[in-house]
């Protein structure tokens, strides 16, 4: 259990509660969760964060009516800056998007601008939105994370409770290496409903070599851990920085979609450009 799982800031969320679906535009459906909930226990201060980054969302179930009442469909790409006061709670995002279904908009740009304005207001931070017609994306192959996969190690695991102990002395030697490690075994659980969240993670670093067995055991220990996607990525970044002390570090996770949305957070203390192609499970 996370230390803030029962925080009063979470009491008003629709997540985990029976909810009516609305199909006429309603910006009030959006709900934010303070980023400070998980940052404070990690001693991450808003004015001195050790990373930059964004939460990248893909919107697969986005539809509205044009001015003549003809349904329109699009795939949306949203980037929410890491400095925003709030992250966007995903069920509320889904309900909000559903409210577009029977609402008329004069243009695609009006939809994009509405999304951008509402998300900025909810997150209290910078948000960018792009909308794509389906024929712009058709035929795109599934992407893959560049790097060395650490999943096929011949080890025995019998403990799935989250622990940073696995990272103790995980970085050794004096030689500085620069490598990218990948795992598809990341699984955590929703902070509120405890439903499973499945993801792939890419860790790029420069520093003393990180023991791959210890890293894998650490990642697997998230299996019973309850936190939102964004919070897990910040925790992983913070733990690796604390225990392994790399000179450069980037952590990027791409999670499978739920409710027509996927969330793909990244955090970095160096130049990093995340590849945004969907992975095979997305």
UniProtKB/Swiss-Prot annotation:
Record: residues binding substrate: 88-90, 229-230
| GO MF annotation: an example | preQ1 synthase activity
Which GO BP terms, alphabetically? queuosine biosynthetic process; tRNA modification
The keyword NADP is assigned to this record: yes
Keywords, sorted A to Z: Cytoplasm, NADP, Oxidoreductase, Queuosine biosynthesis
The record's GO CC annotations read: cytoplasm
Uppermost EC category: oxidoreductase
* Catalytic-site annotation from UniProt: 190, 197
Reactions that this protein is recorded to catalyse: 7-aminomethyl-7-carbaguanine + 2 NADP(+) = 7-cyano-7-deazaguanine + 2 NADPH + 3 H(+)
Query: Which residues are NADPH-binding?
Result: 90-91, 258-259
Would the keyword Membrane turn up in this protein's UniProt record? no
Please name the pathway. Answer: tRNA modification; tRNA-queuosine biosynthesis
One matching Pfam family = QueF
Q: Which PANTHER family match?
A: NADPH-DEPENDENT 7-CYANO-7-DEAZAGUANINE REDUCTASE
UniProt family annotation: Belongs to the GTP cyclohydrolase I family. QueF type 2 subfamily.
What this protein is called in its record is: NADPH-dependent 7-cyano-7-deazaguanine reductase
Q: Which organism is it from?
A: Citrobacter koseri (strain ATCC BAA-895 / CDC 4225-83 / SGSC4696)
């Amino acid at each position: 259990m996370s230390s803030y799982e029962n925080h009063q800031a979470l009491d008003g969320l629709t997540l985990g509660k029976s909810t009516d679906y609305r199909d006429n535009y309603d910006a009030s459906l959006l709900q934010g969760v303070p980023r400070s909930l998980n940052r404070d226990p990690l001693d991450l201060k808003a004015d001195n964060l050790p990373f930059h980054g964004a939460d990248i969302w893909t919107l697969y179930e986005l539809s509205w009516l044009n001015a003549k009442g003809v349904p329109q469909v699009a795939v949306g790409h949203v980037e929410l800056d890491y400095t925003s006061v709030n992250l966007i709670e995903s069920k509320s995002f889904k309900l909000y998007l559903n409210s577009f279904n029977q609402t008329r908009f004069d243009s695609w740009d009006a939809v994009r601008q509405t999304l951008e304005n509402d998300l900025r207001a909810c997150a209290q931070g910078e948000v960018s939105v792009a909308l794509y017609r389906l024929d712009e994306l058709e035929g795109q192959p599934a992407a893959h994370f560049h790097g060395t996969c650490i999943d096929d190690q011949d080890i025995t695991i019998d403990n799935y409770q989250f622990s940073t102990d696995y990272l103790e002395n995980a970085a050794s030697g004096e030689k500085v290496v620069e490598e990218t490690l990948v795992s598809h075994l990341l699984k955590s659980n929703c902070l509120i409903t405890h439903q499973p969240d499945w993801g792939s993670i890419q860790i790029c670093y420069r520093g003393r070599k990180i023991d791959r067995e210890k890293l894998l055991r650490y990642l697997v220990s998230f299996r019973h851990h309850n936190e939102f996607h964004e919070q897990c990525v910040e925790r992983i970044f913070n733990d690796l920085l604390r225990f392994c002390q790399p000179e450069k570090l980037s952590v990027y996770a791409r999670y499978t979609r739920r409710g027509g949305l996927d969330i793909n957070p990244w955090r970095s203390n160096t130049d990093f450009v995340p590849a945004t192609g969907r992975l095979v499970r997305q």
